[in-house]
Amino acid sequence: AAHLELCRDKIHLASGSTIGNAKLNIGVCNGFGLDALFRGRCKWGKYRDNEALFLYTQTGEKVVVFAGGGKADSYKRILGNSYGLWIATEINEHYDSDDSRESFIKVAFGRQAAAMDPLVLWDLNPCNPNHRIYGDYIEHYQETNLPGYLYEHFTIDDNLSISDERREEIKAQYDPSSVWYRRDILGERCVAEGRV
């Protein structure tokens, strides 16, 4: 929110695997989303036929375009604009390929070429450690020491919106030796092994 408040770019991108996913996880976020952070200074609407949240900031109006990125042709919805901030939820569910003209991820990066204050923020839930999101992006940027790159690993214990009591109830629902516990509770990258 601080970046949107002060940045010089007008148009920004919020993406999820679907538009609904992006709106729920970034726009609303159970009362912690952009529409809560800018309460009284924002309104939902359309921007060139795209779902959007219009923000009224210290530096003028900002438009956050919401897009789904999970399908092979999702990139088409984000063409034609330059974006300052790109915030993506569950980035590992976005469509990616080696073709930079069709990969939602690569097209979104390319749409930031003219940004004055570019910023990329991603979240993801752990998945197969061999998923290309790790090798092609996360680990690649860690290894190249890209200026401004920051990777943070969080577990359920880092989620301040969940009470200690509720957190323990959630943990009790899992077998601590299961892949699901490792993924959902510990935030580890792992894959199920053996017979299903």
Predicted feature residues:
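Phosphate/NTP-binding elements of NTP-utilizing enzymes
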Residues: A1-V196
